């Protein structure tokens, strides 16, 4: 990413046909921007008009307010946002004549993160009811910030809609997984993240409740194995936010 603008990323490695920086598109009114990108929240459009420093401080505080208080998470987020060079709102168009989509971007020195618009509280509740799985509260709270989030070039954390599709794909493999020599039923696993171009998922695991809610483990679809929390450096995490810290580092 060094030397590349966010626009360059979208129209280059990001594979988008067109991208617009709302920070720079001073001639674009709210009505015109919403017409281009129907999923653009009014708050994001207003945020794009603020000074860069104010915008960064606002979104950092928004993360703090949206997520449950955990000292180590707040400490990490302070460090993460101290390394963010700029945040912005962009409208990106995948194909000519298709609608643009809204993204919130976080640019660091050597990487970029992109988030899609958040869910409303009633949408989070609807999503929770639609999934027959004990979703952790910290994971659900993240949808207040972004409904879909990824490092540039990665598939990333699924949106609520994509999660349903990915789960179907994940469940098509009828064989079970293995945790060491123990067989694990795929029904116990719920994928929430996929590594781009690989059959590597991060999944909630219903048989592991380390902190009162389900933990998450690395799952290899090709090898049919999941990581063990009983060993060091196996990418098994007691909470969604612990995994998110790993992803943002």
Predicted features by range, described:
Residues 1-106:
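Membrane topogenic helices and adjacent juxtamembrane segments
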Residues 5, 72, 123-126, 138, ...:
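Exposed alpha-helical structural elements
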Residues 8-11, 79, 84, 106, ...:
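Compositionally biased, low-complexity repeat tracts
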Residues 19, 23-54, 58-59, 112-116, ...:
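Long, low-complexity, intrinsically disordered segments enriched in glycines and aromatic residues
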Residues 68-75, 130, 134, 235:
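Alpha-helix boundary/N-cap detector
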Residues 77-84, 88, 127, 131, ...:
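Hydrophobic, Leu/Ile/Phe/Ala-enriched alpha-helical segments that form helix-helix packing faces
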Residues 95-159:
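Extracellular-facing segments of soluble proteins and assemblies that are Gly/Ser/Thr-biased and enriched
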